[in-house]
């Protein structure tokens, strides 16, 4: 009798845990969701790296220009998932960013499919793409840092900060960041 109760209790806990994780994943915007379903905030990512910096890697998939001029986590290696092509979109007049055809091969050059990799971009969208590309290539422990380096934009017309990226993200979380460049961490095409 006690054994049946224990089995039911364990099953109930597992089902509840799965339901909570599923709900958390679906509350994310589609653009930040990944096939692996592994998500961290910038704060959680820094803690995870800090606890096990020998085994946890932080990968910044923004363009080299963003990495250099906006700042970056001091331990983050830059391998862009998308690169600028020097054109502007007709509709919104924004830079056109094309998929970096060497992204997966460059990651494979330095990391194994079994490594724990925490991926950040500006605000979580490109990092989701990077996670999915790496998952397709056989990587299994790749996390999307859902608020990225700069964080999400404030959406409050009454706020002075409306449209500004001051809400969350690595830079706003209190985690270390820098403009200092380390050649071994910079993108080398």
Predicted regions and their residues:
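Rhodanese-like catalytic fold shared by cysteine-dependent sulfurtransferases
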Residues: 2, 20-54, 68-116, 127-189
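Short, flexible active-site loop motifs that bind/organize anionic cofactors or intermediates
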Residues: 14, 35, 57
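Bacterial N-terminal signal peptides
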Residues: 9-20
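Conserved G/P- and acidic residue-centered "switch" motifs that form tight phosphate/ATP-binding loops
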Residues: 124
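Short hydrophobic beta-strand that contains or immediately precedes a catalytic carboxylate
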Residues: 57-62, 79
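Bacterial N-terminal signal peptides that target proteins for export
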Residues: 1-10
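Short, surface-exposed ligand- or partner-binding patches at beta-edge/loop junctions that are enriched
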Residues: 120
């Amino acid at each position: 009798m006690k054994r049946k109760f224990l089995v039911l209790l364990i099953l109930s806990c597992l089902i509840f845990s799965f339901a909570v994780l599923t709900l958390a994943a679906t509350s994310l915007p589609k653009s930040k969701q990944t096939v692996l379903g592994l998500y961290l905030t910038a704060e959680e990512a820094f803690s995870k790296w800090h606890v096990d910096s020998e085994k946890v890697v932080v990968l910044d998939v923004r363009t080299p220009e963003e990495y250099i001029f906006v700042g970056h986590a001091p331990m983050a290696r830059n391998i862009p998932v998308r690169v600028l092509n020097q054109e502007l979109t007709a509709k919104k007049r924004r830079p056109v960013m094309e998929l970096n055809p060497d992204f997966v091969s460059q990651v494979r050059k330095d990391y194994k499919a079994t490594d724990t990799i925490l991926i950040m971009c500006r605000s979580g969208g490109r990092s989701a793409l990077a996670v999915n590309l790496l998952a397709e290539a056989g990587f299994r422990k790749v996390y999307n840092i859902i608020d990225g380096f700069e964080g999400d934009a404030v959406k409050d017309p009454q706020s002075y900060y409306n449209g500004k990226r001051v809400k969350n993200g690595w830079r706003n979380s209190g985690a270390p960041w820098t403009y200092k460049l380390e050649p071994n961490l910079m993108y080398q095409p």
